[in-house]
Amino acid sequence: MRSQPHVLGIVLAGGEGKRLYPLTADRAKPAVPFGGAYRLIDFVLSNLVNAGYLRLCVLTQYKSHSLDRHISQTWRLSGFAGEYITPVPAQQRLGPRWYTGSADAILQSLNLVYDEDPEYIVVFGADHVYRMDPEQMVQHHIESGAGVTVAGIRVPRSEAFAFGCIDSDESGRIVQFLEKPAHPPGTPDDPNMTFASMGNYVFTTKVLVDAIRADSENSDSDHDMGGDIIPALVEAGEASVYDFKDNVVPGATDRDRGYWRDVGTLDAFYDAHMDLVSVHPIFNLYNRRWPIRGETENLAPAKFVQGGLAQESVVGAGCILSAATVRNSVLSSNVMVDSGATVEGSVLMPGVRIGKGAVVRRAILDKNVVVGDGEIIGVDLERDKQRFAVSNGGVVAIGKGVWI
């Protein structure tokens, strides 16, 4: 039996998420609720824990209270075997300053690396929706002999300009790392596809520490993992690509195998929710062999009374639909939809209240939003733009705790 290497996980969770405003007005992007029972960070933590990586540092900064509380309440490990998932806010160990970039966040947290003394470090982002077995990527990294391995997902070349792109040779060595290029490179085996960076990296520890320290002395650097550290290691010939399509997750269906979504905009966030609601969803939340763990509350089951109806929808615990209709929507816990109301193609976060006869279409309602009797949202976008945020795709977004 192959012995397991000593691996430390670092999750970069300090993102502000400006493009998700107003959902990030009061919380860090990784703390944004998703899918009726989760927060965005639950996907990366579930992937790491399912793979057996149980020593994880979550680097936080921007409005981190919700995130810190969620980790402490939802992600408690036994600790008997040195297991931990711990949020790490900026410690100001190098002076009176906060993190200036993702690489600087790791620089300021190198004491954690020295304490753990791992052979390898996985550095993953905290705000994507996907399933992945990181252990397979770690083994690929070890076998490649590279200093860093970058996870790449194949996207159509015509769409790749929106991503950090990887140009690699047939051996998997990265020859260029390009940030949102006008002319993305093809993959070695398909000129019509491009490797887009998933923001997930595996490092040999010494390579990461040396690169982080060298970057800290460069006054021209933005101290960013994708923008500075990876390009420097590519130039040094130390980087390889890991093809995400080779990652085999137990229980994955043909339909959702290889699913990965960057939900950094309101439209992308909305579209990812719509991926969940069909009979055969593009992303299956119900894979018991690779579960996504989320908040567990002591709530009663959802209830449908007086003809309340939900079609093609995800409905969380504690919801009550009373003579109301919900279609193609995702309802988080404790949502109440009153008589005669209609909710279509919408995302309702915990504690939302929809009044009698109200209509909500193509909208995202943050926690504890109250929609009054007879209110109409998502039908007249010109009117909605005067009151709320409306995305380029016409999705109405209403911030936390708003009464309408």
Curated annotation (Swiss-Prot):
Gene Ontology process terms (BP): glycogen biosynthetic process
Residues given in the record as alpha-D-glucose 1-phosphate binding sites: Y99, G164, E179, K180, S197
Domain of life: Bacteria
E.C. designation(s): 2.7.7.27
Assigned keywords, A-Z: ATP-binding, Carbohydrate metabolism, Glycogen biosynthesis, Glycogen metabolism, Nucleotide-binding, Nucleotidyltransferase, Transferase
Top enzyme category: transferase
Catalyzed chemical reaction(s): alpha-D-glucose 1-phosphate + ATP + H(+) = ADP-alpha-D-glucose + diphosphate
InterPro entries: ADP-Glc_PPase, ADP_Glu_pyroP_CS, GlgC_bac, GlmU/GlgC-like_hexapep, NTP_transferase_dom, Nucleotide-diphossugar_trans, Trimer_LpxA-like_sf
One Gene Ontology molecular-function label: ATP binding
Family: Belongs to the bacterial/plant glucose-1-phosphate adenylyltransferase family.
Known function: Involved in the biosynthesis of ADP-glucose, a building block required for the elongation reactions to produce glycogen. Catalyzes the reaction between ATP and alpha-D-glucose 1-phosphate (G1P) to produce pyrophosphate and ADP-Glc.
The protein's name: Glucose-1-phosphate adenylyltransferase
Organism for this UniProt entry: Rhodococcus opacus (strain B4)
